[in-house]
A protein has these predicted regions:
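Dinucleotide-binding Rossmann-like beta1-alpha1 core, especially the glycine-rich loop
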Residues: 48-122
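Short, well-ordered alpha-helices that flank and scaffold nucleotide-derived cofactor binding pockets
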Residues: 19, 23, 43, 208, ...
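Short catalytic/ligand-binding loop motif for oxyanion handling, primarily in non-cytosolic enzymes
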Residues: 38-40, 88-89, 94-96, 161, ...
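C-terminal catalytic lobe of FAD-dependent flavoproteins
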Residues: 326-386
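Active-site/ligand-binding neighborhood in enzyme catalytic cores
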Residues: 89-94, 100-238
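Glycine-rich FAD pyrophosphate-binding loop
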Residues: 22-47
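N-terminal Rossmann-like FAD-binding beta1-loop-alpha1 element of flavoenzymes
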Residues: 3-30, 379
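Mid-domain catalytic core of redox enzymes
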Residues: 24, 221-347
Length: 386
């Protein structure tokens, strides 16, 4: 075997690990099923010159100096602040919900009272989760939380995950907190930016290093075999270290059953207008079918001579063999699914030359910065192994 490592998947996790290993002198082959690198962050320029993200909106944001210093080696960071809205009962309100939301749905006297109670009961905190507010001892706080839960969280969860809120892992409901101020940005991290030339360009620079070769349009699973007697994974019948970033259940032929993932379908529309909506992303929890609309001329701001590009986003059940919905985007985190994943994880640990990393392989709902940090930390633990 001419390679020291086979890396399955050319997304962030695979690309970063390939780069770090190549810098240490290893020979790497990246095998990617799709016809492009960059995973779900892949972007392209449409016919009107608009940079569009094929698999939905991504923004780099992190509080980690390590992540920022690493990733900005491969891109020119353009400062950006994500702004989102949600449409509730026909009213566009900031998302995450903030004090403006209270002003929009309460009269001035009750709004002032509720804002004061929130500040008194969560002192010094910039935000609070709807889960915490639903458990509050203050009736007015509970009522407001219930209003938001019924009008947004519950409906959005049902569409996004095809589950009721009580079925999903609480961490999912906590991803979008309620802001205890008039702050109207989606993230409040130390760093938030977009790569000036796009995510595909950034990923290309990551893997552009001596010792890295890339195969696109190749399903690595057609070349991988599992030998339980030797506790070894083979690639084209040869033993080689394999870093796998795909779906762990698929790797092992669904030996312990299928893990649930959600997929997405996008309806992209080029529109002859300067602006379609107020902000980059608008959520529609009460609308049937789609969950949100992304306007890409606002991610980041792009002036494209009277044209814009919007994407209606429809969550659907993942099915590898379907015409649409055949890309796994999100692991569906429930108590049952996580127990099943742990069975796969324990089984995978038997194979000495197999390393797992990434949202699908780790069965975790990672943000981009978490994937970057996970790959860097994993590499550090591999130093003796490499």
């Amino acid at each position: 075997m001419k390679y020291d490592y086979i890396v399955v998947g050319a997304g962030l996790a695979g690309g970063i690990l390939a780069r770090k290993l190549a810098e240490s002198g290893k020979r790497i082959l990246i095998v990617e099923r799709r016809n492009h690198i960059a995973g779900n962050t892949y972007d392209f320029t449409d016919a009107n010159g608009i940079k569009v993200q094929k698999y939905g909106p991504h923004v780099l944001h992190t509080n980690s100096d390590i992540v920022y210093q690493f990733i900005t080696q491969f891109c020119e960071p353009v400062a950006y602040r994500t702004k989102c809205e949600a449409v509730i009962d026909g009213i566009s309100t900031p998302s995450p919900f903030n004090f403006k939301t209270i002003d929009q749905f309460y009269d001035s006297e009750n709004a002032a009272f509720l804002k004061q109670k929130l500040l008194e009961n969560y002192p010094g905190r910039p935000s609070v989760t709807v889960v915490e507010m639903l458990a509050s001892e203050i009736a007015e706080i509970r009522a407001y939380a219930q209003f938001l839960f019924d009008k947004d969280y519950k409906l959005y969860t049902a569409k996004q995950w095809n589950l009721q809120p009580e079925e999903i892992d609480p961490s999912v409901l906590k991803r979008v907190p309620i802001v205890l101020s008039y702050g109207d940005t989606y993230f409040y991290d130390k760093y938030e930016f977009m790569p000036q030339e796009g995510f595909e360009s950034m990923s290309r620079k990551i893997v552009d290093f001596p010792g890295i070769e890339i195969l696109l349009g190749v399903d690595a699973l057609e070349h991988i075999s599992i030998d339980e007697t030797q506790n070894t994974v083979f690639y084209d019948d040869e033993k080689v270290k394999i870093i796998y970033t795909g779906a762990i259940d698929e790797l092992f032929g669904y030996k312990f059953g299928v893990l649930p993932y959600r997929s997405l379908h996008f309806d992209f529309r080029s529109l002859h207008t300067d602006s379609f909506q107020n902000v980059a992303i608008v959520a529609y929890p009460q609308t049937e079918g789609y969950t949100r609309i992304t306007e890409y001329t606002k991610m980041p701001c792009q002036n494209c001579n009277g044209w814009t590009n919007v994407a209606y986003e429809f969550p659907i059940t993942y099915d590898k063999n379907a015409a649409i919905g055949n890309e796994p985007y999100y692991p569906v985190l429930t108590e049952k699914s996580q127990k099943k994943f742990e069975t796969y994880q324990q089984y995978a640990s038997k194979f000495e030359n197999l390393i797992l990393c990434g949202r699908l392989a780790d069965f975790k709902y990672y943000n981009m910065d978490q994937v970057i940090l996970r790959a860097l930390e994993l590499y550090n633990t591999m130093e003796d192994y490499v």
